């Protein structure tokens, strides 16, 4: 099929069965508040590992994406989900690398029976031959990860020394920390690091023309204790309704306060 005028030609072939967007650095959401002051938590030399652990809504992916976008030519990004098999992950893994190194691992399609650990070993050896350092990010959206512990340890053991490994996850698997530490420096970034500061609350309020110096509004926002997703939705509601929300009451009355708040925000979009 001919390309229309102005349409960009693909610079590489997409690996069969791969959803390309899951091998690309995510775009930042609208009204994203830059968190460059947290980049120091991520900036580690190779070989090293940085683990970001926090519940959903703490801006883990957005923070790493903002940091990665500034150096995209050396970032290998992979998003994995609950339904991914080891074969699916292998294909995503190779495609993510081909995004920055076109033609990488030509053997992958020619030898379909190669085991995942062997794929990672070959991948690491080929990356070493480039003579460059890379950042490898895995955004792990899987919730039942206990089954991944053994394979994760075996895969990490194959990572080459020219890789800074960054893993984003919702739960902690301390049993892998020893393996991660064996690669070099290990840093763990948690909820206390990712929570919005008071100055960030003020900046978000200013972006949405909300008077942060209003006592009730300020109390409403501070009740979220820096939880980025909750703060963002509170901001939206306050900007829409021109009045504060009793978030503490919402927490006390709901088993899933963030879901309840999200539902409330969605309802206002139809008004």
Q: What are these model-derived regions, one by one?
A:
Residues 2-42, 108, 203:
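Conserved adenine-nucleotide phosphate-binding loops and their immediately adjacent elements
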Residues 48-79, 91, 95:
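P-loop NTPase Walker A phosphate-binding motif
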Residues 49-50, 143-145, 152-183, 187-190:
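Sensor-1/coupling segment of RecA-like P-loop NTPase cores
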Residues 54, 76-85, 109-113, 191-192:
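A short hydrophobic beta-strand->loop->alpha-helix junction that borders the nucleotide-binding pocket
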Residues 87-108, 122-125:
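Conserved NTP-binding/hydrolysis module of P-loop NTPases
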Residues 195-206:
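Conserved AAA+ ATPase core "coupling" helix
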């Amino acid at each position: 099929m001919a390309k229309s005028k102005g349409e960009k030609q693909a610079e590489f072939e997409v690996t069969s069965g791969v959803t390309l967007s899951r091998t690309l650095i995510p775009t930042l959401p609208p009204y994203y508040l830059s968190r460059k002051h947290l980049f120091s938590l991520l900036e580690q030399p190779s070989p090293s590992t940085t683990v970001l652990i926090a519940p959903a809504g703490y801006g883990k992916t957005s923070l790493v994406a903002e940091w990665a976008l500034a150096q995209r030519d050396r970032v290998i990004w992979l998003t994995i989900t609950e339904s991914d098999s080891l074969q699916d992950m292998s294909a995503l893994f190779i495609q993510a690398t081909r995004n920055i190194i076109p033609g990488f691992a030509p053997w992958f399609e020619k030898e379909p029976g190669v085991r995942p650990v062997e794929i990672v070993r070959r991948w690491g050896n080929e990356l070493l031959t480039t003579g460059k350092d890379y950042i490898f990010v895995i955004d792990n959206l899987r919730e039942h990860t206990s089954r991944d512990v053994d394979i994760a340890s075996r895969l990490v053991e194959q990572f080459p020394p020219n890789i800074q490994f960054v893993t984003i996850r919702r739960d902690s698997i301390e049993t892998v920390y020893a393996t991660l530490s064996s690669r070099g420096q290990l840093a763990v970034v948690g909820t206390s690091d990712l929570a919005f500061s008071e100055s960030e609350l003020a900046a978000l309020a200013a972006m949405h023309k909300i008077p942060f110096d209003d006592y009730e509004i300020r109390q409403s926002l501070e009740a979220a204790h820096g939880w980025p997703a909750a703060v963002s939705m509170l901001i939206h509601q306050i900007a829409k309704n021109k009045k504060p929300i009793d978030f503490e009451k919402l927490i006390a009355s709901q088993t899933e306060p963030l879901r309840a708040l999200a539902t409330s925000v969605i309802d206002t979009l139809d008004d």
